[in-house]
Amino acid sequence: MKPNKFQIKNTFDWYLTNVLPVVEHRAIQNKYGYHGLYTHTNAVVFRGIDYALSIEKSPEIVALACALHDIARTNDTPDPEHGQRAIPLADRIISEVPYVLTRPERDSILYAVANHTTGMLAPDYISACMWDADRTRISWECGFDAKFFTTEYAKQVSKNSPEEYLQFMRQHLSHRALRIMGELNKQY
C-alpha cells in the first residue's frame, strides 16, 4: 500500500501538536545533533508513520514509540543502554500524551524503546516500524543488510539513496513541520 500524502502529513502534525511538546519537556536528549530530538528523532517519527501506513497499522502509536526511542540519550557516542534507561521516562511521557492506549499497546511501545539497540527482529508492528525507521539511516551510512529490517517498504527505502527519501519527506511535510525540522539533510 502506498501511503496517502495527507495521512502522513496529518499524523506528523498530530505528533508535533500532541507528542513533541511533552517529549521536549521531559526528554534528556539533545535537541540537535546526530541523535537530536529535532533532527534525528523527528525523521524517525516521519519514517515510522510512513512504514506503519505501508502495512495499514496505527501511525499514531508508532509515532509515539519513535518519539521516545532516544529520550534518554545524553550524547552522540555509542550508548547501547539508552533504550533501557528510557523506560521510566517513556512510561511517564506516555501518561501525559493525550492518546488512549490499551495496556498491550503501552507495553509494546515500552518494549520497542527498551530493545531498539539490540539488532534483533521485531516481535510486533510497533517495534517493526520503529526499529526499521531508526535503522534506515544506519543502512544509508553503513550499507544495507536486509536481516535488520522487518517491513518490506523499509527494506526498499533503506537500500535506496537518502536523497530520494529526503525529497519524499519534503513533499509530505507541512510548512509548520519543515520550519521545526529546518534544513533536511542526510543526517536525518
Language-model-detected regions and their locations in the chain:
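His-Asp-centered metal-binding catalytic motifs of divalent-metal-dependent phosphohydrolases/nucleases
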Residues: P59-T77, H82, A86, S108-T117
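Generic N-terminal amphipathic, Lys/Arg-enriched alpha-helix
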Residues: L20-Q29
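Divalent metal-dependent phosphate-bond-processing catalytic cores, especially two-metal-ion Mg2+/Mn2+ enzymes
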Residues: M1-W14, I28-K57, L68, T118-Y188
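Short helix/loop segments within enzyme catalytic domains
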Residues: Y15, Y99-L101
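Alpha-helix C-capping/helix-to-loop hinge sites
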Residues: Q29-N30, Y51, I71-T74, I93-V97, ...
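An active-site-proximal "capping" alpha-helix that borders the catalytic cofactor pocket
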Residues: A43-Y51, E81-V97
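Short, well-structured alpha-helical segments
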Residues: Y38, N42-V45, A63, R103-A114
